Amino acid sequence: NIEHSTQSMVSKVKEFEKRNKEEFSRLSNLESQVIEDVLKLIKENKMQEIGRKMNQNQEYLENIGISNKELTNMIKIGQELSFGVKITGSGGGGCIFALTNESNLQNILKKFKDENYECFSAKIDFKGLNTF
């Protein structure tokens, strides 16, 4: 429940780009590769590798300043028991998601709850929307 403004986060990214053109370009290219890799990994159902790509993405976001102290703490907790963890949304609030397997699910939920974070589990639907 962290108050934030998506607009302020977008401004933060634009400011980073303005001050660090080469680094922003490098990170953008790396991110494009992460996206391509994840699309392949999803088709192959390779959860651990997807988790590693999530962690890479999170590093890139942190490099451009899309995080805060609370998110950083949540990320550290999630990394202990998951394949990967990253912020979701614009990055200024307090929302992340972690990718784990069934055997670690209850442990990771407990860890977050012990730290007084709201959390819930969701399953990935690989089938997607199915019509007749």
Task: Indicate residue ranges for each PLM-predicted region.
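C-terminal nucleotide
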Residues: 1-86, 97-132
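Conserved glycine-rich beta-strand-loop-beta hairpin in the small C-terminal domain of fold type I
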Residues: 94
